[in-house]
């Protein structure tokens, strides 16, 4: 066999091998079209056989999921391979389409498509209304704590309304006690004494240590303090007055005496008294008496400053003021009596 024939046979053999290789390649590409696109074709070898170069895959480490503090509004930022993502993105946008055809000659060796979220993509935030707001709806019923305030006031006792101050002037020779009690004749108002100033010439005090229970002093005494109250009570249609006065007096020599007033309290000079009247809780003042309280008071008869109480059980006596209300020694009470017109001041019948 000549050399030309040998070369022709070798060329024919190589062309047949190349044709068979191309035929096998076409069958393999039809079975796996997707893989053939991602595999670059290169011609190598001594006989010109087509070879397929396996692309290098760059395996990226899986990104850890980090929950967002926003709850349901959190957005997942993950890089998924192109073959596993299915063309979906985390933001709900349109799927990314793959390019068909032969890959670029000078493109990257990796055949994966990296799908990631745009870091600058806007995230949607849903604001939830606060649970504490009621939409401005007004609640019905009694506000909390109002009932407890009423219970606290009831524990302090009954309350009065319509407090009105009065300034009374008692002339010399008039009874201070009668002047104060005259305010209660105009209606169901209670009276309380706040202060007083002036001089007293005759006073009868209640002292249980003495034999008679009361003692009367004559002279000139300055009022240090005067307090007390008078309140009207109605029981079975009958009205009665309860209350009384307490006084503290100072003599010219500096001695102090005082106690509960059990008789007359005669003024030695004009006495100014500040009192207050009010309506007790649960009582109403008649309309015809509104505004008439304190405008006028009955004129009381004058009593001589030197008058001493006369009682059936004890004779009249005169003397100087005692240093002690209990008597005995150098200074003894000038007059003691077992009874008098003011001994029942705590509960007097209504006129």
UniProtKB/Swiss-Prot annotation:
**Where's the PPC domain?**
159-301
Spans of biased composition, class Low complexity? 23-37
Q: Which cysteines are joined by disulfide bonds?
A: none
Give the DNA-binding residues. 97-109, 138-149
Coiled-coil annotated spans: none
Q: Where is the composition biased (Polar residues)?
A: 60-77, 310-325, 334-351
Give the CC-aspect GO terms.
Answer: nucleus
Tell me where it mainly resides: nucleus
Keywords in UniProt for this one? DNA-binding, Nucleus, Repeat, Transcription, Transcription regulation
A GO molecular-function annotation = minor groove of adenine-thymine-rich DNA binding
Q: Where is this region: Disordered?
A: 1-151, 310-351
Matching Pfam families: PCC (PF03479)
Compartments, as annotated in UniProt: Nucleus
UniProt short sequence motif Bipartite nuclear localization signal, positions renumbered to this chain: 97-105
* Top-rank taxon, per record: Eukaryota
Record InterPro entries? AHL, AT_hook_DNA-bd_motif, PPC_dom
Q: What does this protein do?
A: Transcription factor that specifically binds AT-rich DNA sequences related to the nuclear matrix attachment regions (MARs).
PANTHER family, per the entry: AT-HOOK MOTIF NUCLEAR-LOCALIZED PROTEIN 10, AT-HOOK MOTIF NUCLEAR-LOCALIZED PROTEIN 9
Q: What is known of its domains?
A: The PPC domain mediates interactions between AHL proteins.
Name the record gives this protein? AT-hook motif nuclear-localized protein 10
| Organism per entry | Arabidopsis thaliana
Which taxonomic lineage does the organism of this UniProt entry have?
A: Eukaryota, Viridiplantae, Streptophyta, Embryophyta, Tracheophyta
